[in-house]
From Swiss-Prot:
Entry protein name: 2-acetamido-2-deoxy-D-galactose-binding seed lectin 2
Lineage start: Eukaryota, Viridiplantae, Streptophyta, Embryophyta, Tracheophyta
Pfam families per record: Lectin_legB (PF00139)
Keywords: Calcium, Glycoprotein, Lectin, Manganese, Metal-binding
Keyword Calcium listed: yes
Amino acid sequence: SEELSFSFTKFKTDQKNLILQRDALITPTGKLQLTTVENGKPAAYSLGRALYSTPIHIWDKSTGDEASFATFFSFVISDAPNPSTAATDGLAFFLAPADTQPQSAGGYLGLFEKDSSYNSSNQIVAVEFDTYYNSAWDPQTNPHIGIDVNTIKSKKVSSWGFKNGNVATVLITYQPSSKSLVASLVYPSGQTSDKTSYIISANVDLKATVPEWVRIGFSATTGQTDNYIETHDILSWSFKSKLPATKN
């Protein structure tokens, strides 16, 4: 079988095997900062993405087999300290063609081009952690976790009790036998008595959606003015995929 795995417990400023796009950078403290922060304040109209440099063999044309995968990461989103700001827009984990480039900012999360955001030829699967209600395509549950298949309008959505500034841990798995993509988010700190875990799943046919080889990574965006901003920091990330051996 073909296996690939990696683990970043933190990130190095000269991190090999990561492709940083647009505003993404690694901070001196080892965080993968996807969107710009200036003087401690998130910047408006920021878009940043980070991809694992090695493409992943996610399905095999000769056998028709798909890979199973699991990815685990932790992140923090912090709204600006000013109470008049709204947390905007969110971050996503995604799989896309190997030559994937940043797309439209704002509510499109850097994943979709404004004019083709409903086009099934996008070849992208994403799990979004969306803090802002875009009335044109989002359900009214805000903030929410969504599973996106080729379009910014999520195939499946679950409400999410976003906790400003708290570390969230996420596990995303894909099982080819059931074509089941499952994402869970937990706030492990137990600082509040509120609900702290969320789960969402959807049937996704990876073979019908993305190319045989994909790149995986994160994308995040902020809003268009200083009233619609937040930070997007990935603290750790691990991934493992397994594709069954080629049939002779």
